[in-house]
Amino acid sequence: MERLLVLARHGQSEWNLKKLFTGWRDPELTELGIDEARRAGRWLKSQGTQFDVAFTSNLRRAQHTCSLILEEMGQGGLETIRNEALNERDYGDLSGLNKDDARERWGDAQVHEWRRSYDVPPPGGESLKDTAARVLPYYIQTILPRVMSGERVLVAAHGNSLRALVMVLDGMTTKTIASLEIATGIPLVYRLKADTTVESKTVLDKDIDQDD
């Protein structure tokens, strides 16, 4: 039985380009972000991948990425389930601020702690621990059972909601997860064992040109 789980961070958004803290704000993808999502779909198709169901957040950049991936794979009508449990981390008072401006206001060390620590939230926002507290129950109760039943599952979401999943899947600690970066538009392909642990993991090489 194949137990396939593919995680994909959304393509570059307009606020990624402007270096703004995004969180639950809802910007669109840039042209590059659209290209990244389409490229991810082409790569997955080239690997012979097909999905039975897709999950995404309530935010447009993840939904658009999900639809573009599926469109490139010829699966545009696939069942797609949206849930705010997969939303990006809420950056609270940082939302909408330029990252350099935030550093000037609060200092490099404080902003770095808010961004990269596991359990220190920005004012009015969520820490990665808080994000994991909503992502992981949804994964365990809703997504994982479908993977374990043999369905091939795509999750198109966000850097921090996916970091919460990768921390569990890859057995990372709260310290090692701090340095993990998940690139926009790069699928992480997991195959799981019967005990739900990881059998294999494949990552799209950013340097591969899928148009060749």
UniProtKB/Swiss-Prot annotation:
InterPro entries: His_Pase_superF_clade-1, His_PPase_superfam, PG/BPGM_mutase_AS, Phosphogly_mut1
Sites marked Transition state stabilizer: 158
UniProt-listed Pfam families: His_Phos_1 (PF00300)
Keywords from the UniProt entry: Gluconeogenesis, Glycolysis, Isomerase
Entry GO MF terms: phosphoglycerate mutase activity
EC number(s) reported in the record: 5.4.2.11
Function recorded in the entry: Catalyzes the interconversion of 2-phosphoglycerate and 3-phosphoglycerate.
Family: Belongs to the phosphoglycerate mutase family. BPG-dependent PGAM subfamily.
Name of this protein: 2,3-bisphosphoglycerate-dependent phosphoglycerate mutase
Gene designation per UniProt: gpmA
